[in-house]
């Protein structure tokens, strides 16, 4: 049987083309070229076979994620019901925003869903780093010392602390001291070292849950709980703060549910389901949240001021969908790990290892192989799929960075995205995928891009 496929949309215009289809196999069209038209995509049969094998291999772990999704979605449903969310909470406010009921109820939903005493959820936070900065400046005072027990923080936070940059406006300039306990050589926390490093002089013990641009394991809630217990034994009055970016709803509990005093994250990552246009949250002890609110606005007014400009509906909607969307992103990561491990690349975590965030690192070994992977992820995006990512400088980083992010919200990392500093070990850090089907396709297109560039031996 011979069929001819004509007309396709490309780069916003219609183009005619003809591919001779020689066979219909299992719902897909096999072309003379040896490629399978995956209905709408030109993917090599060998890549498709590898993808099928990867998904079969990962099936038990995908099922476990589904169970966590279900639990966390029920928890979120309960939080909405207990807070009494109603349509009236979607009403916009302007000006000072006094009496914004939706804003206050959204805070309650976050506190309940995250297992915290209180929470502060605002679209006014412009990034995860900004949210963390408000929390740090909100609770630390001149002369205080913070101790990071997970080694060097993420690149963009180093300028906030005063480790890099000219120090202008940093914690260091305000007389707040910084100390650091490195991780063990295998990237795990140095619990024995904490027993001596943490002392009553430390006002804050700081934990970065996610790996950032490193290959160390992200921290599970159980590991964070162990750190909390050591910190509270060694320095009972210290504040244990967690950078929870990329970690929300990955497990059934959050750090605040196991004793962390404060944690923060970005709404364009896990907590708002790919719907929030911007924002962040801080959750934890009620007295600390009040201090953070005073830092965000002004002492005395705190959380009682700040209009929402019609954003409440999107924030409520995204928050409700977040547990399910996070699970879809996790499934995408597990599938990608299984697929690229099958191609012979080192991945972390492996498909069968416990996960504490949505990030999947794939070591591509070579600069151009890395670029091919990133470009393939971009090709699988619903927005700007025709864009070809190129390495370029980026504020806060010490080398060129290449990024794929064809997202509806600029910079959203709960939507399928990938980024990588152009330095050894030439690893791509991929995250997101608001539904598994589209995320799976993105990973397959990344593999096809690498095959086309000559970096897969099949």
Kindly give the residue locations of the regions a language model identified.
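N-terminal small-domain helix-loop-helix segment of the aminotransferase-like
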Residues: 94-102, 106
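Conserved C-terminal alpha-helix-loop-beta "cap" of PLP-dependent enzymes
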Residues: 341-458
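Conserved PLP-enzyme active-site core in the AAT-like
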Residues: 38-59, 66, 75-82, 86-89, ...
